[in-house]
């Protein structure tokens, strides 16, 4: 009986804990401290409320100015450009399940990071964390640094 209860307990814990995956791929020559300004390429397919604003505020935590551009032609004057995608799901309320950021400097990818709630978060309570919290984590690993400004 103890073994059955232990198995049920472990199974319940696995369902509730869920898994979050954050991946990063930085070029060896990438120096986040040299970044002062980033142009963000607006992705109209992302339907998460105020996503561009959340991303801009997240870079500001690191002392990096940014601006979102709706027109691809406007990005030609930018040295550093962020392209992104993000998905959301529903479970009583919408929440972000996936995001990927690609940072290009002079047309070359210098950093890439992604966030994924495995199984769309299942019963894990961390799926309810705000989009801002998830984006902040993603920008932190994208830059390979901790925020300097709160």
Protein language model annotation of sequence segments:
Residues 20-30, 65, 112, 116-150:
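C-terminal/domain-edge helix-coil "capping" segments
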Residues 52, 56, 98, 132-139:
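Extracytoplasmic/secreted envelope proteins and their assembly/folding machinery
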Residues 41, 85, 116:
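Residues in well-ordered beta-strands of folded domains
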Residues 68-89, 94, 100:
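A short, hydrophobic beta-strand-centered structural micro-motif
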Residues 2-11, 16-65, 147-150:
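A structural "domain/chain start" motif
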Residues 45-46, 88-91, 118-120:
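Solvent-exposed loop/turn segments at secondary-structure junctions
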Residues 47-51, 93, 123:
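Secondary-structure boundary/capping motif
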Residues 93-119:
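Amphipathic beta-strand/beta-sheet edge segments enriched in Tyr/Trp
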């Amino acid at each position: 009986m103890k073994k059955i209860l232990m198995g049920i307990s472990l199974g319940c814990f696995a369902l509730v804990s869920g898994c979050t995956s954050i991946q990063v791929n930085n070029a060896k020559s990438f120096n986040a401290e040299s970044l002062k300004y980033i142009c963000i390429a607006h992705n109209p397919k992302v339907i998460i409320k105020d996503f561009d604003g959340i991303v801009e505020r997240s870079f500001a935590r690191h002392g990096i100015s940014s601006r979102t551009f709706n027109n691809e032609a406007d990005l030609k004057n930018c040295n550093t450009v962020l392209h992104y995608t993000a998905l959301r799901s529903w479970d009583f309320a919408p929440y972000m399940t996936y995001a990927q950021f690609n940072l290009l400097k002079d047309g070359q990818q210098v950093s890439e990071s992604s966030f994924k709630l495995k199984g769309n978060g299942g019963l894990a309570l961390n799926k309810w964390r705000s989009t801002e919290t998830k984006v902040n984590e993603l920008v932190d690993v994208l830059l390979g640094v901790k925020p300097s400004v709160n």
